[in-house]
Amino acid sequence: MKVAWVLPSFIEGSGGHRTMFQNINCLLSHGYECDVYIEDNGDAKSADDLKKQVERFFGGCNCTYHLGFQISGEYDILFATAWFTAKVVRDYPFAKRKAYFIQDFEALFNPMGDGYLLACTSYCYGLSPITIGKWLTHKMQTEYLSPSQYFDFCADHNVYHPINSVQKEEAICFIYQPDKPRRCSIIGIEALGIVKYLRPHVKIYLYGSNVSGHIWFDHTNLGIISIEDCNTLYNKCTVGLCISSSNPSRIPFEMMAAGLPVVDLYLDNNLYDMPDSGVVLAHYTPESIAQALLDIIDHPEKAASLSQAGREYMKYRTLEYGYEQFYRAVDNLLHDRTIVNAPIEKIYNSPPVIADVIVQNSIKADSYQRLTIPRKRLVDILKHNRNLRKSRLLRTIWNLIKGN
């Protein structure tokens, strides 16, 4: 069988590209021929350059590389992988079957307008969706009436696992990618700022981007790190904060495999794939996210329970398990099997963590742990940071400083 994939240009550290090449390698291991057509953004000059980039960024893939979208030849299946590649696949006449490898609801990457609606239109081209996770399949079924297949969020257990020799710290790690709006870096940083004021001893680790940003509290920015270093980080920290406001990220599942409790947002996209036993979902206000993080930091027994439940949930969700699901989905398309979609139910059934963000003139002194930050230092920080929300948490701090 001969398969072609149409891919957007590479982004270093891109989990989406890593997932695509992992599944291309899955088909190669089953004897498929795979051609990969990659958007020409000027960074590569030849197919050989593309191969070297893949080896450097994602670990390598023995497919046949093509620079640009000039597709030629006949294929048993042609895959679109991003909204602007879907039209290329739709219009190509020499593919027996056409599929859509969907990892995100990409319309959400754009403000409402042309970009949003054109991305939505890509789901109307009659391509057969194979999605990562259940939420996207649910969305394709219910909103686009498109029979869809999915494979689960899995983790590489050779990389992500508990390490007993790593010393635990009272620390939070946050996937900080300000170049990706769906990662909500502003909300995440504001939530971490609240935690840092209330628990100044808690360490904050940022990772996932080499952009430093203008962050007013003490932290360590690790930049783009290897997946092995990610696992060490997850083993070192008390809780991980990973925000994805579109499709779920693979990162929370990798954190769970490593035994790290996870906090993410209580949004519809997270309710179909994330278990309420291993993940805590918070309302999208910074105060609510901060409260969810503090609940785990302040209660070791809760952290231990989440860690155990997360590891148990990921126990059988190895990469090989996901590959087998993906391979069966491709095989169904090749043999023209009818895709019958049963209703997909939510698996996260706990309520969201919601903090009170209403400004009040009077706050009980015992509402939050008394601060240990020196008065002068905290006052200076508050004066110079004009972007802080005067929320209940920060008003509490201010009242404590004034002695109210």
Language model segments and positions:
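A charged, aromatic-enriched C-terminal amphipathic alpha-helix characteristic of glycosyltransferases
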Residues: 298-358
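Short hydrophobic beta-strand element within catalytic cores of glycosyltransferases
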Residues: 261-265
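Acidic donor-binding loop of glycosyltransferase active sites
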Residues: 235-247, 260
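Membrane-proximal helix-turn-helix segments that form the acceptor-binding/catalytic region
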Residues: 67-70, 112-129
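Conserved acidic donor-binding segment of nucleotide-sugar-dependent glycosyltransferases
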Residues: 278-286, 295-300
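Conserved catalytic-core segment of nucleotide-activated headgroup transferases in glycan assembly
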Residues: 19, 139-220, 224-227
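A short, active-site helix/loop in glycosyltransferases that binds the activated sugar's phosphate group
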Residues: 88-89, 109, 125-147
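Short acidic alpha-helix that forms the nucleotide-activated donor recognition element
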Residues: 70-73, 226-237, 257
